[in-house]
Amino acid sequence: LDAAERLLQEGSADLVSMGRALIADPDLPRKAAEKNASAIRPCLGCNVCIQFVGVKQTRCAVNPEMGQETTQVPDPEPGHIVVIGGGPAGLEAALAAADRGRQVTLLERESTLGGQLKLAAGFASKPHFQRLLDYYLEQVDRAEIQIHLDSVVNLDLVRSLQPDSLIVATGGVPRPLILDGSTPHEHVVQATEILATRESLTGEVVVVGGGLVGLDVAEVLSTTADRITIIEKGSRAGSALEWNLCKMRLASLRHYGVNIMLRSQLIRCESSAVVVCNPSGGEQRIQADVLVLALGSVPENPLPQLAEALSCPQTFIGDCRNPAGLTEALGQGRLAGRMSISHNA
């Protein structure tokens, strides 16, 4: 916005046109005119919108309503919504519910909100994710949402809040590595731990999983590790990324010497090495001082007894329902927060 305003003031342009930014927030011009820039939902530049062009649809990672404008929204109704989990899905659900005129209580077990967004926001190469996190923190602060951090959520606590509807957004946990009959590796670490702590690792590093998290952790370690090898069983690393962004991301990693093995699968571990089945079907031994797991997530539901013990409607959203990406998390959060209380399930 500052750059656009400067161009207009200098007379360098008569009009500044925006594309993806207006998909992320169609109200951007109005909010800018009202000097309310912090309320503008930022575009991530993730090109999710471009991915849907081929099927003649428009979607947006951060704007779940894009392409769904004609969907009927229930009339505002009173009621108390309790949201468990302050990650992207939970934050979106809480804001959507508050916007429908409901009393909202948000419970988060950590000392700060954001969940997986905090991991992405820590990248210098991803400044838009920090802006998105700031946007959510600003919006929940403005909304009349009761936020409880460092919350130990249990059945008694939820019952005491007397919710009319419960939205569970407790996220997922890293998928473990299961290799029957394999020798345990001496140094195994989850990729999410490295992204959270920015731990520096040296020596020969093998990353199992070439999804977005695998690419992120390889980027973090590329300046300290002697050599990084990514093992990906699919035909393309970073397959969730839009094609042009994926090409740039992979080119950057290769520039730092990261080796990416496609159509390859880890078949067993040794104390300081791994054995991989390569595309030709042969076995290949790779030195691995550190084994980093980026195998995705599995749902986490720390309160399985809630479903039976509480009579109020309950909705599971985000990774605790089905691990996916930010687009799915925010879409499920918006839908759950907007739904009629009697229809949450």
Feature names for model-found ranges:
Residues 11-12, 143, 162, 183-184, ...:
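Short, structured coil segments at secondary-structure junctions
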